[in-house]
Amino acid sequence: MKKISRKEYASMYGPTTGDKVRLGDTDLIAEVEHDYTIYGEELKFGGGKTLREGMSQSNNPSKEELDLIITNALIVDYTGIYKADIGIKDGKIAGIGKGGNKDMQDGVKNNLSVGPATEALAGEGLIVTAGGIDTHIHFISPQQIPTAFASGVTTMIGGGTGPADGTNATTITPGRRNLKFMLRAAEEYSMNFGFLAKGNVSNDASLADQIEAGAIGFKIHEDWGTTPSAINHALDVADKYDVQVAIHTDTLNEAGCVEDTMAAIAGRTMHTFHTEGAGGGHAPDIIKVAGEHNILPASTNPTIPFTVNTEAEHMDMLMVCHHLDKSIKEDVQFADSRIRPQTIAAEDTLHDMGIFSITSSDSQAMGRVGEVITRTWQTADKNKKEFGRLKEEKGDNDNFRIKRYLSKYTINPAIAHGISEYVGSVEVGKVADLVLWSPAFFGVKPNMIIKGGFIALSQMGDANASIPTPQPVYYREMFAHHGKAKYDANITFVSQAAYDKGIKEELGLERQVLPVKNCRNITKKDMQFNDTTAHIEVNSETYHVFVDGKEVTSKPANKVSLAQLFSIF
């Protein structure tokens, strides 16, 4: 049998077991844990290659044959870092493993059968991840949606109605009429959506009406009054309807301190936004809730990674987002109370420890909607450079750290909001919302985004050129974005109650509509690779953060990876 070098093999079929791949210009090294393709039986499309009739393609049509096969992909997922063919059928991942012609090749299962109806996409040399999920969206402008999509985010969860002051400050779509408006507006876009209703209501009937109108949960925000009563009522109704509650706590400690909020939560599950506190929350010690078993703690991306510029840029952002006035002393003091370098410095470290479980944007409201994925990987790289390899690593790679950080914007937000049955990972049975990356541009610029099994966005050259690659090459919407195809490729998530009442038919929605599930019986221990609980304290005078009695901090970076080098053109 003829043998070829690993270098030759990787150039033809992509990396195999034991090969290592650097992510962008970071120090993060992914090692291929397993290769499910079979040596000598690899799929390869093109002239003189194997993916053709009578060879790796069956001549016999069958009900199992795939709509699309992605060949030789390097899958980076919370489930593992491995090489496989990915089969897609009816908009879902039908199989992961060895694809091809089961009549001619060993190891091909029915769910990876290539037949006359199968399209091919060459995944060799590319990384495939699940689409990102951003759970902290202020729906201020619809232009956020293509921006997020081009970064690799395929699901947006949040609230708002446009550039109203309520939406500029809070991620809330309040009331039945506003929810109807946003659910109908969502029909236009290549993106999955879920909308959060106003939880600042001490009236169960008003809360319930919003869930039955299609909201997937509540947001409680201090600008609407985050009182213990509102917290208790929102959680009571959430428990009844099996939806999540997200919270931005009381920075000014007007209605109580962090201990009062935790008492009102009373051990029930809660998704805490920007849990460090610069984005809002009990000053100076909201960060301590991140260690609790019933809290699903998230960061927003303005504070990660911690850099020499982080503190300076926050003041102006905060004044605009929360309708404050620099000429009013109390407004300035309010802003100052939220911007604490000591707790921001601790945030990066808490991410590396797996105490913070989720990353999100806080779009146009102190956060950048197109940078969730980039900043998550910048934080991972900054922490490796500062603290070295994690103790959990096995072998000469960063696979554990990679899975930890990937989970923060994929599977964990999906679990938190009850959509992990559908999205959030590269697993059989889930919707084929996939992002394809060149390793050199990983975390910054996707090559292509597949939405519901079809290509929705891709880097594409001049449409008048003789081949697809001539300049100018930039992101262009593909066929899955157009016509009625976009209804098949995208999902609007609603509550089970709204789904059962026929909200899709009531509002005349044409997209897929699916119910959220299993939001209330989860805890921190369900957060993949980010389930660490701990006792966290904050010194009320110095703002230094202590985890189980030991101070945690990090240094501000003066240079980060995945930055200007990738944005020259």
UniProtKB/Swiss-Prot annotation:
Cellular component aspect of the GO annotation: cytoplasm
Record pathway: Nitrogen metabolism; urea degradation; CO(2) and NH(3) from urea (urease route): step 1/1
Record's comment on post-translational modification: Carboxylation allows a single lysine to coordinate two nickel ions.
Catalyzed chemical reaction(s): urea + 2 H2O + H(+) = hydrogencarbonate + 2 NH4(+)
Chief location of this protein within or outside the cell: cytoplasm
Cofactor: how bound: Binds 2 nickel ions per subunit.
Encoding gene per record: ureB
Keyword Metal-binding applies: yes
Residues annotated as binding substrate: 221
Domain Urease, residue spans: 131-569
Entry binding sites for Ni(2+) 2: 219, 248, 274
NCBIfam families named in the record: PRK13207.1, PRK13985.1, urease_alph
GO molecular function terms attached to this record: nickel cation binding; urease activity
Subunit structure and binding partners: Heterohexamer of 3 UreA (alpha) and 3 UreB (beta) subunits.
UniProt keyword list: Cytoplasm, Hydrolase, Metal-binding, Nickel
Subcellular location: Cytoplasm
Enzyme Commission numbers on file: 3.5.1.5
Organism: Helicobacter pylori (strain HPAG1)
Residues annotated as catalytic: 322
Top EC group: hydrolase
Modified residues (N6-carboxylysine): 219
Name of the protein: Urease subunit beta
